[in-house]
Each structure stands twice: as C-alpha cells, then as structure tokens.
Amino acid sequence: MIAFTPSAGLRSLKVASVLKRALAQLFIREFYDLSSMLSISGVKVSEDTRNATVFVAIGDKSVDGDEVVAALNDASNSIRRAVFRYLKLRYVPRLHFKLDVEFDNFLRISEIMATTK
C-alpha cells in the first residue's frame, strides 16, 4: 500500500512560493528591461523539487511570447545561478519556462460571452 506523505507535497508548494518571489525580485533588480513586459504568473515544482516549471505572462502584445520564452529557456542556467543568491536552499530546481495563456483564454471567452448576450 502506498502511503501519502503530505510533507512532500507541502515542501514543493513552499519551494514554488519562495522561487516565485525570488524570480520576481531577480527580474526587477537585474533584468529590468524584461520586468516591464512580463510577469511570473505561477511556478509548479515537481515532488522531488528538482524541476520547476515557471509560467510567464507577457504584458506587451507587440512582443512575440514564444521568442521571450525561448530566450528565457536558453538563459535558464544563468537565471538559476542568480536565483541561488536569493534563496537559502541546498538545491535550486532546474527552471523550465512556459508561456501562460490562461489569461488570454479568459479574455477570449469573456469577449465571446459578451457578444452572445
């Protein structure tokens, strides 16, 4: 029988919260040109806290979101090293950036609902 250990799930949630704050501070302080056009909408950390998926929302619609995410993924090792300075963790998870499209989907659905009324 497999026993559920709530501490493992709780640990990944705590790491995700701390990682989200550290990434936000890093983008504000060191990557100021990026911080004005993107925001971190969420961080999901694996149960073993070795990998983290960072969901990024692009505020500026003139910028291609896929290019920004590709650039962030290319620089993920240097971003990870910079995040290490902000965190007091033994191991900083590997960062994988993804474009967050939930807000765009919400806007599209609300526009459709507004036109049907």
From Swiss-Prot:
Top-rank taxon, per record:
Bacteria
Residue ranges of coiled coil:
none
One Gene Ontology cellular component annotation?
cytosol
- Which UniProt keywords are given for this protein, alphabetically ordered? Cytoplasm, Ribosome biogenesis
Localized where?
Cytoplasm
- Disulphide-bridged cysteine pairs: none
GO MF entries:
ribosomal small subunit binding
Q: Please provide the Gene Ontology terms (biological process) for this protein.
A: maturation of SSU-rRNA
Query: What InterPro entries does this protein's entry cite?
Result: KH_dom-like_a/b, RbfA, RbfA_dom_sf, Ribosome-bd_factorA_CS
Hey, which family's this protein in? Belongs to the RbfA family.
Q: Which PANTHER family match?
A: RIBOSOME-BINDING FACTOR A, CHLOROPLASTIC-RELATED (PTHR33515:SF1)
Q: What is its biological role? A: One of several proteins that assist in the late maturation steps of the functional core of the 30S ribosomal subunit. Associates with free 30S ribosomal subunits (but not with 30S subunits that are part of 70S ribosomes or polysomes). Required for efficient processing of 16S rRNA. May interact with the 5'-terminal helix region of 16S rRNA.
How is this protein organized at the quaternary level?
Answer: Monomer. Binds 30S ribosomal subunits, but not 50S ribosomal subunits or 70S ribosomes.
Its name, as the record gives it, is: Ribosome-binding factor A
Q: Species name for this entry?
A: Anaplasma marginale (strain St. Maries)
Provide the gene name from the record.
Answer: rbfA
